[in-house]
From Swiss-Prot:
Enzyme superclass (EC): isomerase
Binding residues for substrate: 128, 305
Cofactor(s) required, per the database record: pyridoxal 5'-phosphate
Assigned keywords, A-Z: Isomerase, Pyridoxal phosphate
Pathway participation: Amino-acid biosynthesis; D-alanine biosynthesis; D-alanine from L-alanine: step 1/1
Keyword Repeat applies: no
Family (UniProt): Belongs to the alanine racemase family.
Gene3D superfamilies linked to this entry: Alanine racemase, Lyase, Ornithine Decarboxylase, Chain A, domain 1
Catalytic activity, as annotated: L-alanine = D-alanine
Positions where N6-(pyridoxal phosphate)lysine occurs in the chain: 32
GO CC, one annotated term: cytosol
Active site (record annotation): 32 (proton acceptor), 257 (proton acceptor)
Protein name per the record: Alanine racemase
Length: 365
């Protein structure tokens, strides 16, 4: 009953726009966290011919990608050695997070007689994962000279890309530039990549050999960006449900847990079978909006695990059981878009979409 409708045409159009924007740079499409909540398998199936790599957070996500298509997949996270035989046999790209990873990985490569493709992750200022900047060149050279590793890429991640004027962006870019110069001195074929969506939109000269357009591919734009071409990018999904019951309040009655919403006599409420148990934000209860038959209605009362209610007022537009309810709109300016919901709940679109769980059906249209 609860369905996330995904437009394959919009997804593909978004990726084509990005490809045009970044020129010759390769596309590494992040599909971690169930493709930001959109459904990993469906997204991979309908995008693989447009991208060069897929990127995931862990090995189980990598396996899911490869169950759909044979395509280069890189893991951003740590090397999970309990799966190393399958990582090697499937040519999954792994990230070197520390100098010591090289020797350990070499031992497994020798044992299985299989050279893995590696990307060296560098900490240029985010201070989360990756080889320390001061140890970068030594690590890159060691990986490049290894007889048992194939150094395919070198990358880092911007800490403040969502704020294009933040001085850390320039600091990280300058550090990465010096590493790129060293790396290209070893081989021009090593893929250097730094930018996520906000990175290459907010900073000049930052595409390098490859970009990693995650949130942009799914249709979400930074507020600061007004480029005409990029503005053609649109959200690819909308979340739908159905009205399952219409309730008419009597005088003095309320609705939901603690009865915090008190309506008027004769007020009608629509019950929608989706709640925080589906990953829909609980904070929206009593302040969010849904669209029923092109009319916006406010949520009423606390959201429960499995349901929410909306006020229809006197139901002048004759909402009925089984009418379609749009909970997340694909139109950014709407009051129920992921952008608007994120603003209401003090979070980001990534959070709104990626927390939608498997109780919600994903459907390509």
């Amino acid at each position: 009953m609860n369905v996330l409708e995904i437009s394959a045409q919009t997804l593909r159009n978004n990726i084509r726009i990005i490809k045009e924007y970044v020129g010759s740079a390769k596309i590494c499409f992040p599909v971690k966290a169930n493709a930001y909540g959109h459904g990993l398998e469906l997204i991979v199936e309908h995008s693989h011919d447009l991208v060069d790599f897929f990127a995931v957070a862990n090995v189980l996500e990598a396996f899911r990608v490869l169950d759909v298509v044979e395509k280069p997949v890189m893991i951003f996270g740590v090397i999970e050695y309990n799966y190393i035989d399958r990582i090697l046999s499937k040519n999954i790209r792994v990230s070197i997070q520390d100098y010591n990873d090289i020797e350990k990985l070499e031992k497994f490569a020798k044992y299985y007689n299989k050279k893995p493709f590696v990307h060296v992750n560098l900490n240029t200022g985010m201070n989360r994962m990756g080889v320390d900047y001061n140890d970068a060149c030594r690590t890159i050279q060691r990986a490049y000279e290894s007889d048992w590793l194939i150094l395919e890429g070198v990358y880092s991640h911007l800490a403040c890309a969502d704020n294009r004027d933040h001085p850390t962006n320039i600091k990280q870019k300058n550090r990465f530039d010096s590493i790129v110069e060293f790396t290209k001195g070893l081989s021009q074929d090593i893929i250097c990549h730094l930018s996520n969506s906000y990175g290459f939109l907010g900073q000049k000269g930052i595409c390098y050999d490859m970009v990693r357009p995650g949130i942009l591919s799914y249709g979400f734009l930074p507020e600061f960006y007004v480029d005409r071409v990029i503005r053609e990018i649109k959200p690819i999904a909308r979340l739908l449900s159905k009205v399952v019951k219409i309730i008419t309040l009597q005088e003095g009655e309320g609705v939901g847990y603690s009865l915090i919403y008190r309506g008027f006599e004769g007020e009608q409420l629509a019950v929608i079978p989706i709640g925080y148990g589906d990953g829909f934000p609980r904070e929206l209860g009593d302040r969010g909006f849904v669209n029923i038959n092109d009319v916006m209605y406010p949520m009423a009362g606390r959201m429960s695990m499995d349901g929410l209610t909306v006020s229809l007022g006197i139901n002048e537009y004759d909402v009925k059981v089984s009418d379609t309810v749009e909970l997340i709109s694909a139109i950014p300016r709407n009051r129920n878009s992921a952008f608007s919901i994120a603003k209401q709940t003090n979070t980001i679109e990534y959070d709104i979409m990626s927390t939608l769980n498997d109780r919600i059906i994903r459907k390509i249209i």
